[in-house]
Regions:
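Topology signature of small-to-medium multi-pass alpha-helical membrane proteins
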Residues: 1-142
């Protein structure tokens, strides 16, 4: 069980760290040049620059994943639920990104896979917690 929490926490921390750094870079320079991204990629999107995507990346994906990592490291009772939500959120983020600007980089697919693994680990953790709780209730006669 410890391996599940450690694996989940590590994935969340790495994804979160990358999102915080890249989100901060997009907020600092919304043209995207710090990340070698051209605003032309946004032509068919609702955005004229990378400021709003940078804010979302920083706050939702970055801060959310780091918070999830802390919950997982502490084996918090909601780590599974939060991790599943963040994993699904990451997959949605990548899906929308690929559909808006195209799938041009292998990292997009790697992050989608990370979201899927995060969701699977979270479900395994939550399933284990639910089974443990069920056994405790059966033993106590509730």
């Amino acid at each position: 069980m410890n391996a599940l929490y450690i694996s989940l926490s590590l994935i969340q921390f790495l994804v979160g760290l990358g999102a915080v750094v890249c989100g901060a870079m997009l907020i600092a320079v919304p043209s995207g040049t710090l990340l070698q991204m051209s605003p032309e990629r946004l032509q068919e999107t609702p955005f004229s620059d990378f400021l709003v995507p940078g804010i979302i990346l920083f706050l939702v994906i970055g801060v959310g994943q780091v918070a999830g990592s802390v919950l997982s490291m502490r084996k918090h009772r909601f780590a599974g639920y939060f991790g599943a939500a963040m994993g699904i959120g990451l997959m949605i983020w990548i899906f929308v990104q690929v559909n808006m600007i195209g799938g041009r980089h292998i990292l997009q697919y790697a992050y989608f896979l990370a979201g899927a693994v995060e969701t699977a680990l979270s479900c395994l953790i939550q399933d284990h917690l639910s089974a443990t709780r069920g056994r405790r209730e059966a033993v106590s006669g509730s």
